[in-house]
Curated annotation (Swiss-Prot):
Coiled coil residues, start to end: none
Biased composition (Acidic residues): 46-56, 89-114, 128-138
Segments crossing the lipid bilayer: none
Protein name, UniProt field: Uncharacterized protein 229L
Source organism of this protein record: Invertebrate iridescent virus 3 (IIV-3)
Biased composition (Low complexity): 11-20, 118-127
Biased composition annotated in UniProt, kind: Polar residues: 1-10, 24-44
Residue ranges of the region described as Disordered: 1-146
Amino acid sequence: MEQQSENVYFSGSESESLSDSESRAQPQNQNSDNSRSASLTPPDSSDLEDYVDSDSETSSSLVNAPKRIKIIRSPSTSNWPRRLTSDDNGSDDDSEDEDESNDEQDLVESEEEDQRSRSSSRSAMDISSEEDSGDDEPSFTLTELPGDVPDFKVYNRNIAIFSIKYLNQFGRLNAGIQETDFPTAKLVNTNRHVVVWINMLENDTTPVTPDSFDSFNLSGAIILKDSSGLIEYMYVHKNSRTVKSLLLDAIATIYNQVTGNDILINIWTQNINIDEDVRFLVNYGFVEPAIVGKNTIQMKYHPKIPHQQTLNEIRRLLGYSKRNVGWINVFLPKDLAIKLFSYVNNYDVEFGGYLPLTSVQKPNGAWVLGWDDTLVSKGESLSVYIPPPQEHQKLEETIIGFHTHPIALSSSNTISDGMVILPPSNIDLKGISNQWLFPRPNIAHFICSPEGLWVVSLTEEFQSLLMGLRDLGEVAWPCINMILFVIFESMFQQHDQKFNYPTVTPITKWFELTDVQDLIKNLTLKRCFNYLNIPMEKFEATCQTISGYQNVRLYDISYNKWESFSALPDEGLYFTFYYKYDDFTGYPRQKSLTTEASN
């Protein structure tokens, strides 16, 4: 996506180096009518000398990077987990509980893919075995005791459940959990159980016993507090939906049915994957969300309550928990998804424009997105021009933007197998970000590709940074230029090194879909500067506005298969987007653009 004076261009499937794209825009008076231009010219080599050491290779590579990229990456296992659960238990009175928790990785789609990843690479829990030197050998109870949770039990062949007091008997699992952010003090507390996914090949007949348990590869675990039924920790390697469901099935069967107690889970609201995670948990049967502590929403397992009712309540709670931030709930129906996919599948050029909010609202207050031919522009094979919002256009017509990545842009060897990947490019992110320097930016932008629908938006923190620089006027343009340059140049180079698939296979497609989301979700200014070997301290001295923003995430992104529009009861998908409001952007100073949704 490339932006000019009063123009917004969206690029095609290939990422492009900012240093190779011509800048057609120069800073203009921000008060000029319909002005959406920005000086996005990358700093030249003389400018970079202010920030790059003379012996660094970055100063030349930044301005001479190739325009066309080749992306290559070998599948590898991720590090030990970052979790979706929160330790802030509300009524739970464990003194060692902490508020801080990391985020869980993106969810994957099938058990078959998860088995491929496990068989082709070491599990994230596959840590060197350690001998236990304890003198007392515990005795394991392999039968259920009435009204009690068993000390050790194998459930559904691939899952083991045992008391945490025996954790030190399993060196590999113990070492793996020790490397996480789970509070060590809780590991010696005996009123907890561990539920673990065991990697077993289909033809493996080795029985799972306390003696053989630690010889298996392990790639999923839940830590459950017995007294309250609270899931304190949850992780699945590559976050397979199937494995997560099986782990929860085991808890529902062994804990809920045996003890009769409720199962609770705490969600950390700062989790970068919260939309995907809560959707999974709600679909599984977790309901009745309530705020129980700082940045913590608690849900209870109760599969009979309608899923959508719970999702709507979570969105409402999340919206009210954010300060000086408005939000909007939208619904993209199946018929609109079919229309968008037809532009991906049937044309060899890009289309782009806006998806207006219709006058129709769902019972929960979400606005239904529609289609207006007058808001859609036809582009070229690798770009599309989207006119900026005009004064005569209503606000609800231009809140949500979109553009297509047609299947024709992909190479012929992938089209024949249906293995097409055209994710958001660094130039797409450039244009989406640049809009926040001008009135009425897109609150969210949909990128329609053969593999599915990508949804990109700026985090509230990145919105605040750009809006603050915008308010400083022309004096801030060099700072803005440098920020955008390092973000998109680092994106370009990381794509170049990580995501090149000459022939896309189901396995490489799955890895790229996961890794693209991971890369974009975890972008921060500090990581971008470090990746390009540019000392951030020198830049911060001349651009003090970025102080406090070095480690904030820049983007939110989600990926949705086209098939998912038919899989849900409403035959469509709900989205919630958050925005910083002020007079310049034109968005209202109210807590929600959808009145009913905020009640």
